[in-house]
Each structure stands twice: as C-alpha cells, then as structure tokens.
Amino acid sequence: MSFIKKEPVLSAAAVLAVLSMFFVAPSPEYLSYIDFRTLALLFSLMTVVAGLKEIGLFRYLGSSLLAGMHSTRQLAFTLTALCFFSSMLITNDVSLITFVPFSILILNMAGLPELMIPVIVLQTIAANLGSMATPIGNPQNLYLYSSFGLSAGELVGYMLPLTVLSALLLVAAVFLLKNKAITLSRTSLHQDECPTKSSLIFYLALFLVCLGCVIRIYSWPVMFFIILAAVLIKDRSLFIRVDYFLLLTFVCFFIFIGNMERIPAISGLLTKLISGHEFPAGVLLSQCISNVPAAILLSGFTDAVRPLLFGVNVGGLGTLIASMASVISYRAYAELPEAKSGTYMMVFTLYNLIFLIIMCAAGWMLLSL
C-alpha cells in the first residue's frame, strides 16, 4: 500500500498493462511496443545529469549568479530564471531537485521566509514551462520527439512562441512581488567550490554524446554503450540515482497502448474521440494522471503532434499532479519545520490557474492561425 502511495502513476500504469493482457495475450510482439530509443535516452540523460549534479556544477553556477544581489525581486528573478533555463537542458525534475532546496537555503540565510512560498511556486512553474522548449527538457517532449520522428528544430519551433510568452509571464509575476533591499555576498552564500576541470570535461563530454543521439547523428545503442562504459569506469554509484520507476512507467504504458491499438473497436473509438481535440485532451488528462502518461496514452491515437505537444506541456500547469515535477517542490517545502502546506497549496493553485488560463488561450490562438 505504501508503494502505491509513493508511486501512484506507476501503479496505475502497471494495472492497466496487466488488464490489457487479458484481451491481447502476451507474445514476442510486445517487444515492438517498446520505444527503446526513448528509454535509452532517458536513462543516459538521467545518469549524466546525476554526475553533473554530483560534482556540484549546478549549485556552483547558482551561487555565482546570486552573489551581489541587491533586492528581493532581483533574488526571486534569478532563482526563477535558474529553473526556467536549466530545465531546458537538465529536465524539469532535476532542475527542481537541485534548485528548490538551494533556494530554501538562500532564503533562510537572507532572512526572507515570506518569499519562500511564492518563489518555490514560481520556480516550479518556471521549470515546467521552460522545459517545454527543447526535446530533452522533459520526458513527454523526449518521447513525442522520438516517437513522431521530429527534428530538434521542428520541436523548438513549435514550442518557441509559448516559451517566450511563459518567460514574459514569469517576469511579470516576479515584478508583482514586494521589493526590498538585501545584500548577498559570496561569504554569506557559502559558495560551493568550482568542480574539478577533469570531472567537468568528462560529464560535459558525455552530455554531448547524449545530444548527438538526440539529433540523430548516431543510433541509440552507440550512445547507450558509451554512457554505460564510461560511467562504469568513472562512478558506477550514479546508476543508483536513475529514476527506474519512471522508466518502468513508460514500459507499462507502452504495453497498454500497444494492446489497445490491437483491439480495433477500442482503437477506432479512441482515435475518433481524440482526433481534432488533442490540445484540450492533453490539458485535461494531464490534470488527472500527469502530463507524461497523458502524452504516452494520447500519442497512440493521433498523428497531430503539435497540438498534443501544446496540450501535455501547458497541461503541466494546474493541479499538483499535472506534472510530477511539481510534487518534488511541494515535498521539499513540506519537509520544513515551519511549513504552511495549506497556504502553499492555495498559492500554488492560484498561480497555476492564472498561468493555465493564459497559456491555454495562447495555445488556442496559435493552433487556429
């Protein structure tokens, strides 16, 4: 029971996969359901980013940027921007895992507890929206990019207008925060040491190997072997940091969708229901089961990738579970002794609904052009 509470999405995906097996008996054809390229890319990126985090690169960059801040708005803007831009390369999950605890530390040291909730909420929104800009920003983008055979330029082009709008909205939201003078020095930040040059070059090189596969310079087995061999030699403990539950969730949904596609009556009905309604379907389904499984489920019954991308990325706004990355921020805040979880949820819901309404309107306008 505790596992179900901890991993509700994986549990639901596993149940759906098992139930679908009663209608389509297990066979070697199941292997054709699995998108091994997406799984290999996710695994490799999670491993390499774990290495970059382990050597302290992100905290070092963050503390370097924060040194010399003179106002609360400047501080809030920098902390929010860190999540917005870093999520484009290291995923929304890793961005929040790295910078939300870092922000809590900084705000406590600066004596600004009143900024804790609005800043963390804005960081969460920033990571979810910033991550939609690139193929590797979040799992749903990586999957749809791979599954639909998009080029990196196509995906970036599709998402650029919404990304620019979200950046402007975040700037406006930060500007509405109460401003006052502060002083943050390098000493007060306890700035992390710069990562060693050899480790930095090693992990950045591996990150470039991943990007090479993303833009299809070489096949995924080549990338997977290089990452596996290099990390085994350098630091095999990084394999423990990989989110294997996320990978299993993908596998379960692949099996469920593959089986549904082999049942003509169900496949035909779902295609009819979803076709032409990918954007609202993505937004609404994300509110209930989160945007990664929503992307996997809906992708099996439509060829319209642009509205689907819009739907599952904008759909990351709204409820706490609309994007599982949002849960990361909430847990980090809720663990604080002085946490006001009720207030957090009120602010989170208010900010998210405002962003969701504006982004949905923008999405509709872009799709109707």
Model regions and ranges:
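Membrane-interfacial loop-to-helix junctions in multi-pass transporters
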Residues: 36-38, 67-80, 109-119, 197-201, ...
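Membrane-core helix-loop-helix motifs of multi-pass transport proteins
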Residues: 111-179, 185-188, 331-361
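C-terminal transmembrane helix pair
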Residues: 156-167, 280-369
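Long, contiguous bundles of hydrophobic transmembrane helices that form the permeation core
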Residues: 168-228
